[in-house]
Structure formats: C-alpha cells, structure tokens
Regions:
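Core alpha-helical transmembrane segments of integral membrane proteins
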Residues: 132, 136-139, 144, 154-172, ...
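Flexible, glycine-rich linker and terminal segments associated
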Residues: 1-64, 69-79, 103, 108-137, ...
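Outer-membrane beta-barrel translocator/receptor signature
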Residues: 148-156, 164-166, 178-181, 347-352, ...
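Short, flexible loop/turn segments at beta-strand junctions in immunoglobulin-like
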Residues: 88-91, 473-477, 566-568
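Short acidic/polar hinge/loop motifs at secondary-structure boundaries
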Residues: 79-91, 96, 471
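C-terminal structured "cap/appendage" subdomains that terminate the fold
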Residues: 551-556, 560-569
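Surface-exposed loops/turns
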Residues: 93, 478, 560, 570-571
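A short tyrosine-centered beta-strand micro-motif
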Residues: 84, 96-98, 482, 574-576
Length: 608
C-alpha cells in the first residue's frame, strides 16, 4: 500500500508506504516501507531533458520547417512565428549534424545548421535527475509483509548535466548493516560515449572495499548504411565489496569482468555481431573466456533466420560450444506468426504459433508452444479475450515425460479481470485499469442510445455505452494528451450529442469524466415574424430555458424569410429573445412528448 503525490510543474513525485526507489551506479534495491522524493521526467513527457546543444532559432512568419539529421529528413512541421529550440525535436544517439530548413509562405528559404553531439544517456546542461528514499526494511511473507522496525534503509543519487556533453553524479546507500558511497561521470565525444562509476563500501561483516566500472558505446549516425555499433565494458569488484542487499559476508567470485561487442549490417539484408568476454576468477573460481557470433538474415519481409554460436572456454579445459538456430514467418497483413528453433546448449527444440490481432478489443489473442528436451515434451498454450467491460484468460501447461515411469503433469488456469471506475459521482464497469481512465457518462435522455468512443472504420470502438451504463477508456498514460472522439450513429434527429472531440491530460492514476449530450431532444423548426406579420429576416436571437436557469442560452439566426431551425431544445418553457429588441421576449412551451423535428409554426414577436 502506498500514497503518491505528484508535482508536475517541477517533475517531482513523493511516495509514502511500500516504496519502490530508483538506483544508480553500483546501487541495488531492497524492499522497504518509507518515503521517497524523486525527479520523474514522465510527469513532463513533452519536455526534452537530454542534451541538444544551445540551439535556438526564430521564425518571423508562419513557415514549413524541415528537420534534417545527418542529411536525412526526420520531421516536417508547420510552425507559427516565434522562437524555437531544437531540444523539442527527435535525434538519434551518436554524432549528429542537424539542419533546420525554413520555408515561409512566399517561398523564401533559410537553412540553419547545428553541429553537435547528442546521447540519450546524458542530461542537458543544467538538468538534474535524483531520487532519495528513507524507510525500514521489509520482506514478503506468505501472510503479507514483515517490517523490520529496528533497522533502516536510505538510498539516494543525484545527477547533474554540467554541459550538454558532460554529466556527473554522486550516490549513497546506508543501512544498519552496510554503507556505500559512489560517483559517476558520463561524457560524449564524436567517437562515442563513455561512462565511469566508482563506489566504496563498508559492511559489518567485511572490511572496506571498492568497485569500478567503465563503459563505452558508439552508434553510427542515421545516414550510415552500415549501422555500426561498438560497446565495451570493464568491471572490477573487490573481494569485500558489498551492496545494500548484502546481509551476510560478501561474495564476489569474479574479480574483473571484461566484455566487448561489435555489430553492423552486412549484405543482402543480413546483420551480424561478434562478442568476446573474459572473466578473471577469485580464489577457487576459474577464469572464463566467452565468444559469440550472431547472424540475422531477413530473407523477405515475412521470413527471417537467426543463428547464434557461443563458446565458453574455462581454465580447466571445460570448453562448451553451443549453437542456436531459429526461423520465423509472419505473413504480411496477418495476425498469425510461426517460429521454430533448435538449441544445442539445452538440447531442445521448439515450435510456436501466435495470433495477435492489431486491435485486441473484442478479439482473441492466442499462442501455443511445443518444446522437446531430452527429458520430456512440454505443451503450453493460452487464449485471452478482451471485452469492453472485462478480460478473460485461459492457460494450459502440460508436461509429458519421455520416460513412461514418470508422472504426467497438467495444469489449467482461468483468470477473469474487471474493474469499477468511480469519477465525479459516476460509476461504471470496465476492463482492468492500468493507469488513468476516462469515463464517458451519457445524459439521461441519451441512455437508450449507444455512444461509441474513438470509433473505427469497422464499426468497432475503444469503448461504448450500453445497458451497463457509462463507457470507460481504461488505459490512458498519465500526463500525456489524449484525444477522445464520440459518435452516436443511432441518435434520432433532434437529439444533441454536443461536442464530439475532447482533449484530456490525466494526472497519475486519475479518473476524468466526459458528459456526453446536452439534454437537447428537439430540432425546432419555425418562422419568426414581427407584430405586423412580416418576416424578421436575417436576425440573431437566443432561446433561454426558463426551467433550467443554469443551462447556457441557445443562439439562432433567421434566413431572409424569417425561418429558423434550432438544435438542442427539450420539453419545457422557453423565452425567445431577439438582439435588436433587447427589452422584450416571446415565451412558449414545448410539450412533454416533443422529440425530434418539431414544427412550432409562425411566431409573432412583440416588436411594438
């Protein structure tokens, strides 16, 4: 159980209760109950916090703006006059040269170039990322959770973007049994990105020790046809180095771990990578060398092959070579996918079929797998159905021993999930809600008519009203802007749905209500005349509901013949006002059975 309070304007989240906290460097996590304060960039999803150079440009007139990264156009926008920053545009990791081509409404073109380095692991200059948590240790038990009120846990880190190419930070973790202090630095160059972490620890069961990790990564720019990637790492852990999870004597059987990997696109839609690793053991742990080779061949847009060879060479001659080969077939435009693989390391083979429609609502997702090992055959399969109001899953797993003397094991499980959504006095049944939700509540006069939410061309929708009441959109990501479209295909003439397009920006695990329909059920048709019986042509006026004083006035206008048609009225008393005669009105009443197109005939307005 936990409470969450967000401060979106500062991208801060405070959590109290059973907490989950972020970690950095050599930090680890330990279950705890307490409070956390963290910078959460997900609270400002449209704000870029990664480096993009000190690059602003001005637009004097409404213009078409094309963004080029390393000569390749990645985005085209139409922007209004103002000052803009390329922090708001997408860029791939690696060394990038960016050009902004601005074309105004009369065809004049200006190109502005911004050569700079960008890497998604860095913070922009002046940006800060942090997480601080304090509490008491806890652990899960068969009866719930057990809290160690005699102990404590503190975990925190803080990273700062010093420049767009340099980020540095520090971190600390403390408990009643262990202390750890660390620091890191990350910097980007045209030959790649580097990161180094260092940490010092002291545990009650061990002496003071340290750990160091250095990483390197290079990724080709977007314009490269080779798509090269290169990564390397070196990690050293001292014999007595301990993390916050360490409650006994530390165990670090590997002193130094080295790894390097290189990959690129080759030929004929083939890509490959090679890797090498070396572990230097400590004490009785032998040294270990590992080699790997991976090839992926995209034969067609539907068929791909993969091959992996790995070799492990131990110091005592315990060599091991493994091969993995796989093929997958995904027919174009089909939700079906077929795959088969062979693994010599586990001496197993498997075949798999899956069915995953692009739109799952109102459809079934299914998969089935048959695996063969030296000991048995394993058959597993599942099917999941998603309805507007619930989800249901059936899962079957069966183990068939190849040795007839062993017991056959079969397990079938059924799961059903639904939810009740509460918002602003409205209640509705929904399929399980993952984050935020929007509840669409129809006006009482529209309850007998179906309202589709975000309708599609195949007459399906993301949600709809029915005999169970309001519709619910259950899976909206917090702090993003979502468009909600309403459609009522069976609504009779005269019944008013009101606004049909809404924009919502929900907060964390919140519920939003959209009220569909104004209550209007009458399309009023008639003629407006003056006291002498002549048409009041080309006049503007309003209808005001006497019985509903909070209801906004309904504006109308007449044609040259004085005729008007007004949507949004309902049974009850009204006052008709004409703008040029602001000191007088005409009162009338629509009967209780008035619905649809209602002809009120000729209205003689008291113009004298």
């Amino acid at each position: 159980v936990r409470l969450v309070r967000d401060f979106p304007e500062n991208a801060l989240r405070v959590t109290a209760g059973d907490i989950f906290y972020a970690s950095d460097g050599f930090q680890s996590t330990r279950s705890a109950a307490g409070i956390t304060l963290a910078r959460n960039f997900a609270l400002q999803p449209y704000r870029s916090v990664r480096p993009a150079g000190d690059t602003q440009f001005d637009i004097e007139r409404t213009s078409r703006v094309e963004v080029f990264v390393n000569g390749q156009r990645v985005q085209t926008l139409r922007l209004a006059p103002g000052r803009y920053n390329i922090r708001n545009f997408p860029f791939a990791s690696g060394p990038n040269d960016v050009a902004i081509r601005i074309t105004d409404e009369v065809g004049r073109t200006e190109t502005i170039r911004f050569p700079f380095i960008f890497d998604a692991t860095l913070l922009g200059a002046g940006e800060q990322e942090f997480s601080h948590a304090i509490g008491v240790p806890s652990e899960s038990t068969p009866t719930g959770r057990d809290y160690d009120t005699g102990g404590y846990v503190f975990s925190g880190f803080h990273n700062i973007g010093i420049t767009d190419a340099l980020t540095a930070g520090a971190n600390v973790q403390l408990s009643d049994e262990q202390r750890q202090f660390g620091a890191n630095v990350r910097f980007a160059t045209r030959i790649g990105t580097f990161r180094t972490d260092i940490a010092v620890s002291h545990a009650d069961t061990a002496s003071t020790d340290f750990a160091v990790r250095t990483q390197y990564r290079y990724t080709d720019d977007l314009a490269s046809s080779a798509g090269r990637t290169l990564s390397a790492s070196a990690i050293y852990r001292g014999r007595d180095f301990a993390t916050i999870e360490t409650t006994a004597e530390p165990s670090n059987p590997v002193a130094l771990d080295l790894a390097v990997s290189y990959g690129q696109r080759l030929f004929w839609d083939t890509s490959g990578s090679i890797g090498y690793g070396r572990q230097f053991g400590r004490g009785d742990t032998p040294d270990l060398d590992t080699y790997s080779l991976t090839l992926i061949q995209q034969i067609t847009s539907e068929i791909s092959l993969s091959f992996v060879e790995s070799h492990r060479a131990g110091a005592e001659g315990n060599d091991d070579t493994r091969f993995f080969a796989g093929v997958s077939y995904a027919p174009f435009g089909s939700p079906h996918r077929f795959a088969a693989s062979l693994d010599t390391g586990t001496r197993s083979s498997r075949i798999n079929w899956s069915y995953a429609p692009s739109y799952t609502l109102g459809d079934v997702q299914a998969d089935a797998t048959l695996e063969r090992t030296p000991a048995d055959y394993t058959l597993s399969g599942s099917a999941r159905y998603t309805h507007y109001r619930f989800e249901g899953t059936v899962q079957h797993d069966e183990n068939l021993p190849r040795d007839g003397d062993l017991e056959r094991i079969a397990l079938t499980s059924l799961r059903f999930g639904t939810a009740l959504a509460f918002a602003d006095g409205h209640v509705a049944a929904s399929r399980p809600i993952n984050d935020s939700s929007v509840l669409i509540a129809p006006h009482p006069r529209l309850r007998d008519y179906r309202i589709n939410v975000n309708p599609r061309e195949d007459e399906e929708a993301d949600a709809r009203t029915d005999w169970l009441g309001p519709a619910v959109l259950p899976s909206l990501t917090s702090y993003y802007v979502h468009q909600v479209v309403l459609d009522a295909p069976d609504l009779p003439i005269g019944f008013e749905l009101g606004d049909q397009i809404y924009g919502v920006e929900p907060t964390y695990r919140s519920g939003t209500v959209i009220r569909a329909g104004t209550g209007g059920t009458v399309l009023l048709d008639g003629y407006l005349l003056d006291a002498a019986g002549k048409p009041l042509g080309l006049h503007v006026g309003t209808f005001t509901a006497v019985d509903e004083p909070d209801r906004p006035p309904i504006k109308f206008f007449t044609n040259r013949a004085g005729r008007f048609r007004v949507l949004g009225l309902s049974p009850g008393r009204y006052e008709l006002w004409v703008e040029v005669f602001s000191d007088r009105f005409y009162r009338f009443e629509l009967p209780e059975d008035a619905a649809g197109l209602y002809n009120i005939g000729r209205i003689e307005f008291p113009t004298e």
